UniProtKB/Swiss-Prot annotation:
GO-annotated molecular function: phosphoadenylyl-sulfate reductase (thioredoxin) activity
UniProt keyword annotation of Calcium present: no
InterPro entries in the cross-refs: PAPS/APS_Rdtase, PAPS_reduct_dom, PAPS_reductase_CysH, Rossmann-like_a/b/a_fold
GO terms of biological process kind: hydrogen sulfide biosynthetic process; sulfate assimilation, phosphoadenylyl sulfate reduction by phosphoadenylyl-sulfate reductase (thioredoxin)
Name of the protein: Phosphoadenosine 5'-phosphosulfate reductase
Active site: 239 (nucleophile)
Family from the record: Belongs to the PAPS reductase family. CysH subfamily.
Pfam families per UniProt: PAPS_reduct (PF01507)
């Protein structure tokens, strides 16, 4: 089979799929982030989408991908509990980069969820996972389906957490190709890119936040903390979008 045959890859077990993509990933590791985006647009199937949480370093991947695909749909899963600074940052970047923003939300409003389940994020790992399934995973699955996505760009980096340390440039997740063009970047490379292109960090960066999600499960970084400890009370790093 062709290693870029999405249907055939989806029929394989996870380990076999990774093996089938190993040679391609070895080639992609040697490319720049810009070249990885170009390669994906030329070799992977459309429709293409880009997801963003509009977090601390979100401007990097948003700028990187839209420089080559200006009209790519940008998927935001909005929980309704983002920081006010995040919503303003979304507006700012959407205008600055002329983003084709697609906002997806849970079918139940935040108030309805609290009435039905209570504050899920205060109910341990199981509650957090249920909250994430409702507010992140289901809306993302719906977005991928409605936008007919076959290739998904995301801005994950290996040095963000242990759960991301071994991710490849190219994989298959939720039935679509997933490409991570800045997977091997460090904080210095991110800073240099932002400076070069006149882009900003999320406003809360200057207040001591290394990672930003919902108001109720995000903490400022303090000396001695790992970055993943600033999210979900240190119980989880991933919100569910990038698992599986």
């Amino acid at each position: 089979m062709s290693v870029l045959d999405l249907h055939a890859l989806n029929a394989l077990e996870k380990d076999a799929r990774a093996g089938a993509l190993a040679d391609t990933n070895a080639q992609l590791e040697a490319l720049s982030a810009e070249a990885r985006v170009s390669w994906a647009l030329e070799n992977l199937p459309g429709e293409f989408v880009l997801s963003s949480s509009f977090g601390i370093q979100a401007a990097v991947c948003l700028h990187l991908v839209t420089q080559q695909r200006p009209d790519i749909p940008v998927i935001l899963t909005d929980t309704g509990y983002l920081f006010p600074e995040t919503y303003r940052f979304i507006d700012e970047l959407t205008e600055k980069l002329n983003l084709n923003l697609k906002i997806y939300r849970a079918e139940q409003s935040p108030a309805w969820q609290e009435a039905r389940y209570g504050k899920l994020w205060e109910q341990g790992v199981e509650g957090i996972e249920k909250y994430n399934d409702i507010n992140k995973v289901e809306p993302m699955n719906r977005a991928l389906k409605e936008l007919n996505a076959q290739t998904w760009f995301a801005g994950l980096r290996r040095d963000q957490s242990g759960s991301r340390a071994n991710l490849p440039v190219l994989g298959v997740q939720r039935g679509v190709f997933k490409i991570l063009p800045i997977i091997d970047w460090d904080n210095r490379t991110v800073y240099q890119y932002l400076q070069k292109h006149g882009l900003k960090y999320h406003p809360l960066w200057d207040e001591g936040y290394l990672s930003v999600g919902d108001t109720h499960t995000t903490r400022k970084w303090e000396p001695g903390m790992a970055e993943e400890e600033t999210r979900f009370f240190g119980l989880k790093r991933e919100c569910g979008l990038h698992e599986g």
